[in-house]
């Protein structure tokens, strides 16, 4: 896959069939990412899984979900996503692509399709996640900057969530060296969030990589950010959590990383602080 990736205009018929099947599974009511990934693993692709829906029971997926797929109730929302991706000529990575990241593919609820902007070669780089507080101390920011800079210089892509605070420090420190950073969005690939993040988004698109599993045009929704955290950890060999609050997305990422058999490291805040 080249730097520009598999944009809509360059998808062949087989890829478009796989993409449509991936959307069918994504939008099939009651199926979920875990079952969709199980089907793709069992049958070899999303397209093969859709064609073999009468055999879903063999893959451990409820036959009622196959019946739901057969109703076609998913077609409206799938078509909306298809059209939006076509309209923006989105760069699309499919489960069947040889450049789909091996680490990400290994997680139990790996996305069947995601969208990208930037340097797709980073998908083949070893990744390490740096996440943490939006209101980090000077010490926390310094640690995140130092670790991100050093790891990036060693050829490791720094993975984070494009939020303010530690996320932004990690991305900027990685890009300042050799441009090895991946930002995982909780919005559509074409949606800027936070609104004041334009400079960071531009830098990531030019020198790093942005990815999102959500349909183009998806606006910020609180429930989507914890969902994307499994991809942050899934792309990474390990996760460094810097000064995370007791109830935070960073600790969700840490828990998911442990479930994915990743290494987890922590930099706590001051002893009497909540982080």
Residue ranges: model-predicted function:
Residues 2-16, 86, 92-275:
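Glycine-biased, small-residue-rich flexible motifs in mid-sequence functional cores and linkers
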Residues 2-98, 266:
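Short, small/acidic-rich helices and loops at N termini and domain boundaries
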């Amino acid at each position: 896959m080249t730097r520009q990736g598999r944009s809509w205009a360059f998808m062949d018929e087989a890829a478009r069939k796989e993409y449509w099947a991936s959307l069918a599974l994504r939008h099939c009511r009651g199926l979920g990412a875990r079952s969709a990934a199980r089907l793709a693993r069992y049958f070899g692709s999303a397209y093969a899984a859709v064609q073999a829906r009468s055999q879903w029971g063999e893959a451990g997926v409820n036959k009622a979900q196959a019946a739901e797929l057969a109703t076609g109730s998913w077609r409206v929302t799938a078509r909306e996503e298809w059209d939006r991706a076509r309209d923006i000529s989105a760069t699309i990575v499919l489960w069947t692509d040889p450049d789909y990241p091996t680490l990400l593919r290994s997680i139990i609820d790996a996305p069947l399709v995601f969208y990208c902007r930037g340097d797709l070669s980073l998908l083949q780089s070893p990744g390490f996640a740096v996440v943490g507080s939006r209101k980090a101390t000077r010490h926390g920011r310094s640690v995140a900057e130092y670790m991100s800079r050093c790891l990036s210089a060693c050829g490791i892509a720094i993975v984070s969530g494009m939020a303010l605070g530690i996320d932004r420090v990690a991305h900027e420190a990685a890009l300042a060296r050799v441009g090895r950073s991946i930002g995982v969005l909780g919005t559509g690939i074409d949606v800027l969030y936070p609104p004041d993040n334009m400079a960071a988004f531009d830098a990531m698109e030019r020198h790093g990589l942005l990815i999102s599993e959500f349909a183009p045009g998806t606006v910020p929704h609180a429930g989507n950010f914890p969902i994307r955290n499994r991809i942050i950890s899934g792309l990474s060999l390990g996760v460094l959590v810097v000064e995370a609050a007791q109830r935070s997305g960073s600790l969700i990422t840490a828990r998911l990383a442990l479930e994915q058999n990743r290494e987890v490291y922590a930099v706590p805040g001051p002893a009497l602080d909540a982080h």
